[in-house]
Curated annotation (Swiss-Prot):
Family membership: Belongs to the universal ribosomal protein uS11 family.
Pfam family for this entry, one: Ribosomal_S11
Quaternary data: Component of the small ribosomal subunit. Part of the small subunit (SSU) processome, composed of more than 70 proteins and the RNA chaperone small nucleolar RNA (snoRNA) U3.
Residues with Phosphoserine modification: S16, S139
Organism, as annotated: Homo sapiens (Human)
Protein's name in the database: Small ribosomal subunit protein uS11
Comp. bias (Basic residues): 142-151
Source taxonomy: Eukaryota, Metazoa, Chordata, Craniata, Vertebrata
Functional summary from the UniProt entry: Component of the small ribosomal subunit. The ribosome is a large ribonucleoprotein complex responsible for the synthesis of proteins in the cell. Part of the small subunit (SSU) processome, first precursor of the small eukaryotic ribosomal subunit. During the assembly of the SSU processome in the nucleolus, many ribosome biogenesis factors, an RNA chaperone and ribosomal proteins associate with the nascent pre-rRNA and work in concert to generate RNA folding, modifications, rearrangements and cleavage as well as targeted degradation of pre-ribosomal RNA by the RNA exosome.
Recorded superkingdom: Eukaryota
């Protein structure tokens, strides 16, 4: 009798997701943190910035809309990203921090600091921290009209 089809032994292949590096050497990625007053994005790419590795937002972590930009949601998002990076073999991150910018506020939102802290506490090595908020040399007219926003 011929052997059954379901009983054949399959060779297991070991799949390596990350680059081959020496022990103790850091593998860097770039973490783009965009912290507005409505949401916080934690987005990890490769060093060129073209290939997305992981992207999590504060809104993906909490139910209520008002909590999307909160420090707690940013912390949860950053922990998720750090865990995914470790699975893929990334051990260190350069940080690019961004606020809304343009003709709006140049101040990062409430989730920026806690996202950065959560990345550091989860065991990721931090390389460079850079502020990449778009600042215009001469902006378009801000919304609100001639007499401004009246409260």
């Amino acid at each position: 009798m011929a052997p059954r089809k379901g009983k054949e032994k399959k060779e297991e292949q070991v799949i390596s997701l990350g680059p081959q590096v020496a022990e103790g050497e850091n593998v860097f990625g770039v973490c783009h943190i965009f912290a507005s007053f409505n949401d916080t994005f934690v987005h990890v790419t490769d060093l060129s910035g073209k290939e997305t590795i992981c992207r999590v937002t504060g809104g993906m972590k909490v139910k209520a809309d008002r909590d999307e930009s909160s420090p707690y949601a940013a912390m949860l998002a950053a922990q998720d990203v750090a865990q995914r990076c470790k699975e893929l073999g990334i051990t260190a991150l350069h940080i690019k921090l961004r606020a809304t910018g343009g003709n709006r506020t140049k101040t990062p939102g409430p989730g920026a600091q806690s996202a950065l802290r959560a990345l550091a506490r989860s065991g990721m090595k931090i390389g460079r921290i850079e502020d990449v908020t778009p600042i215009p040399s001469d902006s378009t007219r801000r919304k609100g009209g001639r007499r401004g926003r009246r409260l």
